[in-house]
Amino acid sequence: MRKHLLWASATLALVIAACGGSTPTSQATPTSSCANAGAAHHAYVVVQHLSGATLQKCVGFAGDTINGEALMVQSGVEYQAQTFSFGKAVCQVDNEPTTYPKCFPDNKPYWSLFFETGGAWASAANGYTTVNLHDKEALGWHYVQATDPSPAPPPLATVG
């Protein structure tokens, strides 16, 4: 009798564990976290890796605009930049590439910069430090092959 009770208790525990399962570690749909979410305006950072994986971060701000460099810093997206005679250039975003002996290595992938306004991407004419974003606009980074003469922008920001 005791063996049957132990077996029944173990079976019941397994059924309860299976039905009541733990919280999933990842979600089916990506979410966008927002720093300073209560602010009146929001701008976004959208990152697309060479693998196609994407990341989006949101930053709330009070003024009419937010500078691209302030957006990157406040978003919490990891990035590394180097200063050149023309200004700052981004060499690494969200830990890609894992190492970079040169910011612009010959025949290697690089970060292409885009600016989203009005629901459409445009290539950035200047560096990220000169971009000023308004409410619901985005800064986009796409890690692309050096052989790509006209890189595609990352996915549009999901405005929340």
What is each PLM-predicted segment?
Residues 2-7, 19-160:
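Ubiquitin-like/PB1-type beta-grasp interaction modules and other compact soluble beta-rich domains
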Residues 10-12:
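Extended effector regions of multi-domain proteins
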Residues 14-18:
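C-terminal motif of bacterial Sec signal peptides marking the signal peptidase cleavage site
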